[in-house]
């Protein structure tokens, strides 16, 4: 049974207006930004490792380099495509390496530093000098830095992006009130990594990402797409696993979060239900694409500001519908929900949605992948007699 007839008129009208519009706007015309291809991965990760290794007092560049590292994992062409599809017309310049001369103990050395738009190569040269100084100091003591404490450890780039994932979860607030929370969370989750790199400036790195996302909002689209891609790939290192967990939590703490059928009042990310990261991916992508169809950022605000309408308009997303049913109808709102909802209006909207599903006999148990025990519990809570085949329920 189609759920289209459950849509509210205002949602249908908005959908029609948006889908029939023949025009678009172009943003950020004249902006110039670097984009990095796969070949730049090693150099970008190594530079990020230097920020972790040293107590470098200029961390404002670290976020830009971190996003370039994310682009290098996505690939140059895909990164440009993401920017274009998000409605940004920025001029993209390929990241390259440039020769630079530094002096160490009276001797000149030729090195290569990253050539990135908006970053002074001299700062990166100073960073290289400090990193070499840390390594030399260790060698003087007769010790050798373990491989996982060096600036060229393979997971340095992802460690920095873990902090970015925490920052994304706070962007919806519109201010930096969450900076201290980001720092505390990062020091807790990245405890082992902080032990490896005791000079890691977590707060400064977080501030760098706040600044970057404010100056270049198009990087948010790049980072979210990267996070989805990274989180959907099986395997990987321990830190990559940490990133996936942090990103998916951030993707739920920010924009449109459904937990027990309640839409949280925040903007930028989506996370649905209580399933694992892998199981959430289809639901996340589904609603993210819906919001993009509604007009990108405007789509997220539409979902946030119209909870009742949005719950109904999103019923054309099958994975979303099954999660709403599992959380709102099956596991809480109808039946034995305990506790006082923080927002009564949102609670009532979700409850009304769940009841409509029930009244119109559109509950599809097979879409929920329930155990026999869960199915029995939901049937009891919904007060439904299960006397029809699975696919027809």
Curated annotation (Swiss-Prot):
Pfam families the UniProt entry points to: Pneumo_ncap
Record-level GO BP terms: symbiont-mediated suppression of host innate immune response; symbiont-mediated suppression of host PKR/eIFalpha signaling; symbiont-mediated suppression of host type I interferon-mediated signaling pathway
Known function: Encapsidates the viral RNA genome by forming a left-handed helical nucleocapsid that protects the RNA from nucleases. RNA replication depends on the availability of soluble nucleoprotein. The encapsidated genomic RNA is termed the NC and serves as template for transcription and replication.
Subunit architecture: Homomultimerizes to form the nucleocapsid. Interacts with the phosphoprotein P. When in a monomeric RNA-free form, interacts with the phosphoprotein (via N-terminus). Interacts with protein M2-1; this interaction allows the association of nucleocapsid with the matrix protein.
Keyword RNA-binding: yes
Family of the protein in this entry: Belongs to the paramyxoviruses nucleocapsid family.
Alphabetical list of InterPro entries matching this protein: Pneumo_ncap
Protein location: Virion; Host cytoplasm
Gene assigned in the entry: N
One GO CC annotation: viral nucleocapsid
GO MF terms held by the record: protein serine/threonine kinase inhibitor activity; RNA binding
Annotated phenotype, changing residue 234 to K: In strain: Non-pathogenic 15
Keyword terms, alphabetized: Capsid protein, Helical capsid protein, Host cytoplasm, Host-virus interaction, Inhibition of host innate immune response by virus, Inhibition of host interferon signaling pathway by virus, Inhibition of host PKR by virus, Interferon antiviral system evasion, Ribonucleoprotein, RNA-binding, Viral immunoevasion, Viral nucleoprotein, Virion
Protein name per its UniProtKB record: Nucleoprotein
Keyword Ribonucleoprotein: yes
